[in-house]
Amino acid sequence: MTFILRLRKVSLCLTAAILFLVAESAPAKTIGNHTAVYNAQGTLQPWTSWNDCLEREMKWYLNCPVENGYPRFVCMTFMEDTYTLRSDRPDFIPSMQNGMGIISYLKYYQHIEKKNPKVLEFARAMGDYLVKESLTPDTGKYPRFTRSTGIANRFPQPPDCGSQADHPYEIQPDKGAIAGYALALLYEETKDQKYMDQALQNARVLVDNMRVGDDTKTPWPFRVDYRNGEPRGQVCSNLSFMLRLFEKLDQLGHHEFNSAWDNLWDYIRSRQIPNLATSGSLWVQFFEDYEIQDNKNAWAPLNLARYLIEKKDDINPRWKEYSKALIDFTNKHFTSIYDGVLICGEQDDDRSPWGGILSTYGAVLAMYSAATGSEEYKGLAYQAMNYCLYAVSDDGCPGENAKEPNRGGWQEDCHTDKIHNLLDAMAAFPEWAK
């Protein structure tokens, strides 16, 4: 028996040695721009600390050349790693890209205790572009409203600048809400009245065009012709930024939006959230480059969950239940496994782990975990954000996703809709940043 046990032990040792040699000879797995690092339990680890990754990326962007009064990335969506426009993609998403960019840069400015004035300077540049260069004409149903799409390096955008899936004279109401909210935050930081004036203009235009929603249409359509208000796509899934805009303006002394906030929250609570458990038809349409009208997306439910987690009982005592329903809807429809990590895609028609949506997923799950004390999503949040950050190169230049090695691309995915998410996850669990 002793002899047999010794043989088994020798056999196991030989097997382990062979497996070690095979592993050593196999090429290392690459995620994004780096060799993947896993711990003994198979959990994806950061390629560098989150703090270091953040500083590398911010340094790379703060070195971006300034032309026509703006850092180049402010005026284009498809930027190469040479800080230049990708020649085959002149299309541009000013409100989403620069609105989320302002939010990211203001949050980072607070993170560094306001020690680098260039960060605020770049946030102001994004705000200035929205206010000065990206408005509809002062006529029609959506006058002087920030454009959802346009053309790179135009100063200002022409009246017929609609691009991607927008028609030439179309805007997206929810993107105006994103821009308006960001401009209100920028006013709060700088006290520059032009940012407040545009935030108020966007909000007032939204209120003027608000309609009664039901089970087939939301209080605003997804797209409208700004000249006559003709809708295209009756459902706009991203309503949380209208709530944010109205609330922030109220906090800044403009109380005219309280009724609109109340009516909108009542619609979300009574119609949109219950729709998660049925067809999901009120969670379709968000991304500027799509016009498929039954295309559910992850961005809108995750950002509503973020808002509820931030507000907690101040908005509704059922905030935990609602937030979990929004996260579970996202997990059900948009997640898949890449390299052993549960990642989140954007929409029914695109499940790739783009930087904007994956960092949103990681941040919101981290915030929920910290706010509730639940461990259910905590590990998923950590690995999702780790995966996302593998897209950042050693020099700080990010790619648009970590699915394969790449540098540059969609600036919203590379950078502007990512930094604020990383900071939110770091605030939820500071130990993850070290």
Placement of each model-derived feature along the sequence:
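Non-catalytic carbohydrate-binding regions of carbohydrate-active enzymes
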Residues: 60-70, 136, 190, 204-209, ...
